[in-house]
């Protein structure tokens, strides 16, 4: 099992975030628990966003190294 936040896989974080969203959407969560879950979800969301941004930068570098044309650019962000 992962011991550090950095060791947790993207897919595991995404699944955890989906579970939090389902729990909050159910409405069966006490207010204090809902706030805690929301805060946890926001932290996971930031981690996922950072991971995606790093992956995007890596792909841009790889494509750039291979001197291949691409319609993709780091400026074209749809989020």
From Swiss-Prot:
EC number(s) stated in the UniProt entry for this protein: 3.1.11.6
Entry-linked InterPro entries: Exonuc_VII_S (IPR003761), Exonuc_VII_ssu_sf (IPR037004)
Catalytic reactions on record: Exonucleolytic cleavage in either 5'- to 3'- or 3'- to 5'-direction to yield nucleoside 5'-phosphates
One GO BP annotation of this record: DNA catabolic process
Localization (cell): Cytoplasm
GO cellular component assignments: cytosol; exodeoxyribonuclease VII complex
Keyword annotations of the record: Cytoplasm, Exonuclease, Hydrolase, Nuclease
Pfam families: Exonuc_VII_S (PF02609)
GO molecular function terms listed in the Swiss-Prot or TrEMBL record: exodeoxyribonuclease VII activity
Function: Bidirectionally degrades single-stranded DNA into large acid-insoluble oligonucleotides, which are then degraded further into small acid-soluble oligonucleotides.
Subunit and interaction comment: Heterooligomer composed of large and small subunits.
Family, per entry: Belongs to the XseB family.
Protein name: Exodeoxyribonuclease 7 small subunit
Annotated source species: Lactococcus lactis subsp. lactis (strain IL1403)
């Amino acid at each position: 099992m992962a011991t550090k936040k950095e060791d947790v896989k993207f897919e595991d974080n995404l699944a955890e975030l989906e579970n939090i969203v389902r729990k909050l959407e159910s409405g069966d969560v006490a207010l204090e628990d809902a706030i805690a879950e929301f805060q946890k979800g926001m932290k996971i969301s930031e981690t996922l966003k950072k991971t995606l941004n790093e992956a995007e930068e890596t792909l841009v570098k790889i494509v750039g190294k291979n001197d291949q044309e691409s319609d993709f650019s780091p400026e074209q962000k749809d989020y």
